[in-house]
């Protein structure tokens, strides 16, 4: 069933911290990773090959074509811009969501350790703090090592020069040298809002130079079929535009 999402733990950081105080020698990030590991060991992940095929198919379709098939309602705000130089022209993956306190990246660190190959980490920056970067070079490099398919942050980053050399798409609202808090609270794999769009864990994220599209998993098969048809039509219109016969509608 291509519309069956993978089952993953939802991690409320504040609740975990209250229930399981970390040891004196253990910092909070290490503690959260340990707790997440306990959850992961008891959770059976399910992701069918048909679902992965959907992601591969969406990676061949420009976000503009997808947006046109969805009533232009699932595109993130243009404040979220591409900062890296990834290989290819369109990128897609499965959303791993993070709800983060404004300017705090504690739960983003935990999500990086929790993420699997092909995931796209999507972060809401609650409160809109814009003078604290949520990620930098070390985290970008680790995300590339983990073979993630993208990072989408509704907040700023730093180490922009390094970001340009990272081979995966990195989207953010801007840059600042200011560092993040690392205190929490936050949650992983819960519904969030990023770039003005609702994102649920397991949704399909499609990215290109134009921006970021979110496709609800339950709609993915129908959206894919419609977008593929529209792409064929648009390609024919481009050819016609080259000889002056296109219907521009």
Predicted segments with their positions:
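Channel- or pocket-lining gating/hinge segments that regulate access to a cavity or pore
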Residues: 210-213
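Short hydrophobic targeting helices and cationic amphipathic motifs
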Residues: 2, 7, 28-32
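Feature captures the catalytic cores and cofactor-binding loops of soluble hydro-lyases/lyases
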Residues: 35-201, 215-249
């Amino acid at each position: 069933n291509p519309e069956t999402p993978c089952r993953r733990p939802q991690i409320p950081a504040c609740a975990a911290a209250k229930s399981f105080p970390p040891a004196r020698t253990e910092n909070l990030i290490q503690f959260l990773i340990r707790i997440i590991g306990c959850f992961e060991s008891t959770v059976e992940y399910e992701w069918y090959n048909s679902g992965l095929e959907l992601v591969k198919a969406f990676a061949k379709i420009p976000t503009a074509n997808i947006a046109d098939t969805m009533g232009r309602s699932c595109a993130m705000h243009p404040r979220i811009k591409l900062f890296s130089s990834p290989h290819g022209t369109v990128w897609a993956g499965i959303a791993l969501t993070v709800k983060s306190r404004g300017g705090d990246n504690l739960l983003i660190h935990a999500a990086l350790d929790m993420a699997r190959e092909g995931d796209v980490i999507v972060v809401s920056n609650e409160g809109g703090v814009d003078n604290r970067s949520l990620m930098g070079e070390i985290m970008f490099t680790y995300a590339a090592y983990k073979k993630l398919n993208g990072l989408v942050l509704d907040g700023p980053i730093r180490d922009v020069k390094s970001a340009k050399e990272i081979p995966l798409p990195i989207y953010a609202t801007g840059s600042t040298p200011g560092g993040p808090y690392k205190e929490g609270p936050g949650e992983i794999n819960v519904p969030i809002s990023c770039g003005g769009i609702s994102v649920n864990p397991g949704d399909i994220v499609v990215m290109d130079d134009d921006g970021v599209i979110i496709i609800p998993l339950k709609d993915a098969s129908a959206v894919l079929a419609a977008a593929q048809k529209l792409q064929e039509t648009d390609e024919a219109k481009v050819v016609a535009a080259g000889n002056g016969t296109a219907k521009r509608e």
